[in-house]
Amino acid sequence: SGHIINVSSTADRDMYLGGNVYSATKCAVDALTKSLRLDLLEHNIKVSSIAPGMVHTEFSEVRFHGNKELADNVYKGFEPLSAHDVADALLYIASRPAHVHIGDLLITCTAQANSNVVYKS
């Protein structure tokens, strides 16, 4: 028995301009998760995926090649998820009773409808 939890993204569901490679890799994570679930079922190994939306990390700074001003603008006008929010969701998935399996969990901040739509005040 065991549990594998892969981290995907909302970008595997809703692609965004300039995110072709990122979205493709997250789609691959989703396919791997589903395939492993089938392959490992008889061994009582759970395989789950969590797909976070916008999380305030260094992701945007890396995406904009160190341009902190551009990166900070991504998160202006709304409260994105924190790494702690995602960790809480991971813990929730991992702590379910043995007979309960969460295959896929989508988590976003309240202001985010999908990868392309975020309400900013």
Predicted regions and their residues:
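Active-site helix of classical SDR
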Residues: 25
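C-terminal helical subdomain
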Residues: 49-50, 69-116
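Conserved SDR Rossmann-fold cofactor-binding beta-strand/turn motif
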Residues: 46-56
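Catalytic tyrosine of NAD(P)H-dependent dehydrogenase/reductases that use a Tyr as the general acid/base
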Residues: 22, 30
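Residue(s) in the substrate-gating loop at a strand-loop-helix junction
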Residues: 9
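Active-site loop immediately N-terminal to the catalytic Tyr-X3-Lys motif
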Residues: 14-20
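Alpha-helical segment proximal to the catalytic Tyr-Lys
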Residues: 38-42
